[in-house]
């Protein structure tokens, strides 16, 4: 069975973005994201794809979800729906969903794992991660709080579905 992991950095209010960008810069989170996703298919929505500074993400199979039938994402595969994107991952052990908010919302009921970077900030934004219902998710692992090289406190948390 395909393991489906949602990976995200979330502020205390579950904000993940503002104006199609992350409202903080935590180099250690980017390093974790890269290490975790290398060699795995990553699935994202069109807006997330368009926000990437480097496209496609190297060392990963990039799959972009867009309802626009003629949408072209150079260096990536496109899919019309989350279900179609997951079907492209049929031979993989794990698919990693990397956003944005709409895709996370669609994927949450299907997810087996959550890899959340808890960012100790409360920020204004326009994109939010879905609430993590503790009746469906148990905390499997948590790092101690750390302070990034940019001065922001954070922790990495791994949740498993009950």
Swiss-Prot record:
It catalyses: (6S)-5,6,7,8-tetrahydrofolate + NADP(+) = 7,8-dihydrofolate + NADPH + H(+). The keyword Oxidoreductase applies. It comes from the Bacteria. CDD domains: DHFR (cd00209). GO terms for molecular function: dihydrofolate reductase activity; NADP binding. Pathway: Cofactor biosynthesis; tetrahydrofolate biosynthesis; 5,6,7,8-tetrahydrofolate from 7,8-dihydrofolate: step 1/1. Pfam families: DHFR_1. Gene3D superfamilies: Dihydrofolate Reductase, subunit A. GO terms for biological process: dihydrofolate metabolic process; folic acid metabolic process; one-carbon metabolic process; tetrahydrofolate biosynthetic process. Its EC number is 1.5.1.3. Substrate binds at residues 7-9, 29, 60, 117. Residues 3-161 form the DHFR domain. NADP(+) binds at residues 8-9, 16-21, 45-48, 65-68, 98-103. One of its GO terms (cellular component) is cytosol. Keywords: NADP, One-carbon metabolism, Oxidoreductase. Belongs to the dihydrofolate reductase family. Key enzyme in folate metabolism. Catalyzes an essential reaction for de novo glycine and purine synthesis, and for DNA precursor synthesis. This is Dihydrofolate reductase.
